[in-house]
Amino acid sequence: SSVCRRLIFRTSRPGERASSQNSFHVRYFRTSVVHRDDLVTVKTPAFAESVTEGDVRWEKAVGDSVTEDEVVCEIETDKTSVQVPSPAAGVIEELLVPDGGKVEGGTPLFKLRKGAAAEAAPSSVTEPVTAAPPPPPPPVSAPTAMPSVPPVPTQALQAKPVPAPTLPEPSTLGGRGESRVKMSRMRLRIAQRLKEAQNTCAMLTTFNEVDMSNIQEMRTLHKDAFLKKHSIKLGFMSAFVKAAAHALTDQPAVNAVIDGATNEIVYRDYVDISVAVATPKGLVVPVIRNVETMNFADIERTINALGEKARNNELAVEDMDGGTFTISNGGVFGSLFGTPIINPPQSAILGMHGIFQRPVAVDGKAEIRPMMYVALTYDHRLVDGREAVTFLRKIKAAVEDPRALLLDM
């Protein structure tokens, strides 16, 4: 605070001689220093190396109040959407990028006045409107006598019938309009990558079927104890992920990739499996890393965490980077059969389908078993048919009898 002086003039009382002592006196008072609200510029967060830019979609407008960590905008990249929160409570002062504009990491997004409050809009007070009195009811008219009907002449009775006039046809129910919606960055990137895979890879698909009887029985017997110990439900996906890791270790070519820049084959001694997850915004493929070191509980826990983040639109770009193999489960939508498309730059993808009761031959007898078709699409430039068929049979054996995993068979 600072000290100020003010000179006050005082008039003389009657009979008092004017002097410098009684004409003025000094009054001291204190003032507070005025603190202005801090204005900060919020920038685009850094992206992963595989992402260069994104499209901005604003959740707030200029003048809106925000609390700390409240989402101000969302940046849609090729792989996921990144939410940008407010670093502090305050008011949006200025938007530096238009809605739908492209930004890179570190681009200034908006200006925030910290600690400010939004101006409340003046509430307009309207005077109560007196309802108009209802109109008086119309006067009741006296009944009018109907005129007598003259007799119909004989010629009219013998007249020929006249055809009724043609009525216009009723209009067709429902419209036939069209609408155009701009492709989102994620949808556009998915389309580009799928076409890239089709144009680059020599894709071939091999099929097999899996008897799910044993894995269903194992789940029924141990699901309660599994949930009690690990606090996570036991599903079927972990069995296929673990079986895929087992088969990838046995057939390293399926886990490898072609480096087009050097014309070399890159073999990986680790297994990172991408699991396709459908979201309202499109298909995302978060990665389960080092699956070869995981047990069923670790896999189920990771799948559950990644699925929850995908449904809440909280996946980071780092969650989807990399991956040496992909599993897509169309069975959750009731798929019977299908051929998945490779997720580049990977060399193969496993497609799971629905479990249906079908008659199968067991020891020379027909039995009804829960069966699932599985499909492996692979890049024939790198993976031979023998390796692909052997790989799929490894998965079939491990799922039908999980003891094969324990015995490393």
UniProtKB/Swiss-Prot annotation:
GO terms for molecular function: dihydrolipoyllysine-residue succinyltransferase activity. The 2-oxoglutarate dehydrogenase complex is composed of OGDH (2-oxoglutarate dehydrogenase; E1), DLST (dihydrolipoamide succinyltransferase; E2) and DLD (dihydrolipoamide dehydrogenase; E3). It contains multiple copies of the three enzymatic components (E1, E2 and E3). In the nucleus, the 2-oxoglutarate dehydrogenase complex associates with kat2a. The active site is at residues 380, 384. It is an enzyme of class 2 (transferase). It comes from Takifugu rubripes (Japanese pufferfish). GO terms for biological process: 2-oxoglutarate metabolic process; L-lysine catabolic process to acetyl-CoA via saccharopine; succinyl-CoA metabolic process; tricarboxylic acid cycle. The lineage of its organism: Eukaryota, Metazoa, Chordata, Craniata, Vertebrata. It is found in: Mitochondrion matrix; Nucleus. Residues 121-180 are annotated as: Disordered. InterPro entries: 2-oxoA_DH_lipoyl-BS (IPR003016), 2-oxoacid_dehydrogenase (IPR050537), 2-oxoacid_DH_actylTfrase (IPR001078), Biotin_lipoyl (IPR000089), CAT-like_dom_sf (IPR023213), Single_hybrid_motif (IPR011053), SucB (IPR006255). The keyword Transferase applies. GO terms for cellular component: mitochondrial matrix; mitochondrion; nucleus; oxoglutarate dehydrogenase complex. Its EC number is 2.3.1.61. CDD domains: lipoyl_domain. Residues 131-141 have a biased composition (Pro residues). It catalyses: N(6)-[(R)-dihydrolipoyl]-L-lysyl-[protein] + succinyl-CoA = N(6)-[(R)-S(8)-succinyldihydrolipoyl]-L-lysyl-[protein] + CoA. The keyword Signal does not apply. Belongs to the 2-oxoacid dehydrogenase family. Its cofactor is (R)-lipoate. Residues 39-113 form the Lipoyl-binding domain. The modification N6-lipoyllysine is found at residue 79. This is Dihydrolipoyllysine-residue succinyltransferase component of 2-oxoglutarate dehydrogenase complex, mitochondrial.
